[in-house]
Curated annotation (Swiss-Prot):
NCBIfam families: PRK10885.1 (NF008137). A single active site specifically recognizes both ATP and CTP and is responsible for their addition. It holds the Pfam family PolyA_pol_RNAbd. Residues 228-329 form the HD domain. Catalyzes the addition and repair of the essential 3'-terminal CCA sequence in tRNAs without using a nucleic acid template. Adds these three nucleotides in the order of C, C, and A to the tRNA nucleotide-73, using CTP and ATP as substrates and producing inorganic pyrophosphate. tRNA 3'-terminal CCA addition is required both for tRNA processing and repair. Also involved in tRNA surveillance by mediating tandem CCA addition to generate a CCACCA at the 3' terminus of unstable tRNAs. While stable tRNAs receive only 3'-terminal CCA, unstable tRNAs are marked with CCACCA and rapidly degraded. This is Multifunctional CCA protein.
Amino acid sequence: MKIYLVGGAVRDALLGLPVKDKDWVVVGATPQEMLDAGYQQVGRDFPVFLHPQTHEEYALARTERKSGSGYTGFTCYAAPDVTLEADLQRRDLTINALARDDAGQIIDPYHGRRDLEARLLRHVSPAFGEDPLRVLRVARFAARYAHLSFRIADETLALMREMTAAGELEHLTPERVWKETENALTTRNPQVYFQVLRDCGALRVLFPEIDALFGVPAPAKWHPEIDTGVHTLMTLSMAAMLSPQLDVRFATLCHDLGKGLTPKNLWPRHHGHGPAGVKLVEQLCQRLRVPNDLRDLAKLVAEYHDLIHTFPILQPKTIVKLFDAIDAWRKPQRVEQIALTSEADVRGRTGFEASDYPQGRWLREAWQVAQAVPTKEVVEAGFKGIEIREELTKRRIAAVANWKEKRCPNPAS
């Protein structure tokens, strides 16, 4: 029995990155030998065991053979005669097909170390094409390591295009698509994930609402980058700089979906694109089974992001109605989330990346003023039932009006 550290732990150690999870491969052992050594079996489809002390995963060396469609259509063979090289060959990328023995020696039969140094994401073998989920995994790795200047090998991108054209991605379940997307959205450069998917044709298949934005022009006066798809990825990049929150990043990604519905004869203007985009957000989220809290924020951002941009000319009544619309009284975090997504929208434009966004500050300040109006005083004044809410709203509007006159006066007044 020989035990090797494999995959991501070896890769990240060689890159000088923190190692989070460790996976191990056991060569020359049977399931019974693992059980006798105190390991706990957890894998149903193939033998995976938990170490009795560390609870890290130890998998018996195995091979995989395509036996059906999609990413689940594989037959696994695990036995003592499966070599380490054979186990590593089934992995997706050469940089993940690395192992380290107990003496610290690196086993690298597929030149993963060379590709690490060259900053290349390259598939191990033609078997890559048998698993459509790997298209998304490569896109995610490209996003994860974009700050290290990794790129996808030409032959790997070509294979990803072939897989997409052959309809392989249609076998992916919504849950798996969303899981990879969720992980990609939490990387330092989530926009790279969607750019890679577009480069291989997968964006049109998996995210048609986003793909439809490319080639849709916006007024050059407001959008020097012109292309709405390009702007969308720029705003996502900016959102990633402004916030680590998944919901903020996802909402930013979806903020301009409504522009994909604008008739060509109305280009480059997109009046009403915010409310129009709400149904597309709903459609995308329903198809991919996006969590409800992410969906709800994305719908609000789509509908109201342009309103935030016009904050200086908003009436106090409109500002308080906005807080009502986003349910800020029960979910106050939404004020900050919408401020961040609106800022990402403005700064996610060519030449505006370093711009100040005072509207975000004003929105936050107005919220502090509005929520500081005490409900207790309204009740003590004798108001009852629906009168309480009506009076509370009046007082909130008055408080915001007083604040706005001092801090954010209407430029037209």
